[in-house]
């Protein structure tokens, strides 16, 4: 279902504001969380849409609307806002991410071609090692972020073009590529164990990474 508001898509085309798509997204962001309502997020955001609004702006309006609902009586809106921010991030980085994520190796190669990653890292590990490294990436861990935590990671630490605000990676790929880079020169017999343990620790937020490493 659409209304009369025109939306400017990423490819430059326009379409009617799809209210059903927005509802589906907000429902997914609220799934499994107590004390939150997709309808409340939609009501909070609805008056902010205007003709010519971009899809990225719609996403940010939804994020802001959810974050405005965070209070002591409804703390779980911090996770709703984080998920809405995450959905927009995935769309920007991966496109149609619902079809699945690329492997961490493919992501590294693609990023190296864009000159955002060190191209020598890919050759430091064998095919079998990359297969194991990829099997440990758990994108569901992104869902554990609070809004404040994810906003900080997106704004400060993910690889991006600061002039356009285009982001090139997700939190889990950042964590795994940091781990792979740190232990690349360690002995082959032990480095995969170190990578997995370090990735698990930072992606589960058991330890914090020093800012110079993340940046």
Regions found by a protein language model. Give the residues of each.
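Extended catalytic cores of very large enzyme megasubunits
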Residues: 1-215
